[in-house]
């Protein structure tokens, strides 16, 4: 993973976390569908977009206006689209996650708001990519 600007920890690379790690079924389905949609719409080939497990290079931190990103769950999604927009090198590594015991996650309403936020970021990505409007995330 040398010379990557963004490394993403993916629960979906080389395995099914619904079976292996006990990921809740609705989270699994939603995550897979949203990731497939983002792959299709944005042309970014990753197995997962909805992870907080990320490593940033110095180059990423210097070129990407990540301080303009949201302060919640959308941060990770925004950084992936920013890396693609700024033509930075990104890749994935396989990780595992435990869904037993205490864990922090969003509820159904927060999840719905998160999905709407994803669509908003995708729209801003396209507007910037085609030079219609450059939101602060893509300047």
Model-derived features with residue positions:
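Acceptor/aglycone-binding surface of glycosyltransferases and processive sugar-polymer synthases
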Residues: 1-73, 100-109, 113-119
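DNA-recognition element of transcription regulators
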Residues: 77
């Amino acid at each position: 993973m040398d010379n990557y600007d963004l490394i993403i920890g993916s629960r979906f690379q080389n395995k099914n976390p619904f079976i292996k790690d006990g990921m809740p079924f609705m989270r699994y389905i939603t995550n897979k569908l949203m990731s497939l949609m983002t792959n299709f719409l944005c042309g970014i080939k990753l197995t997962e977009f909805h992870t907080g497990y990320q490593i940033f290079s110095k180059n990423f931190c210097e070129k990407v206006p990540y301080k303009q990103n949201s302060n919640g769950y959308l941060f990770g999604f925004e950084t992936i689209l920013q890396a693609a927009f700024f033509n930075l090198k990104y890749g994935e590594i396989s990780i595992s996650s435990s869904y037993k015991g205490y864990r922090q996650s969003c509820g159904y309403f927060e999840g719905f708001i998160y999905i709407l936020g994803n669509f908003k970021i995708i729209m801003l990505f396209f507007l910037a990519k085609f030079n219609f409007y450059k939101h602060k995330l893509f300047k």
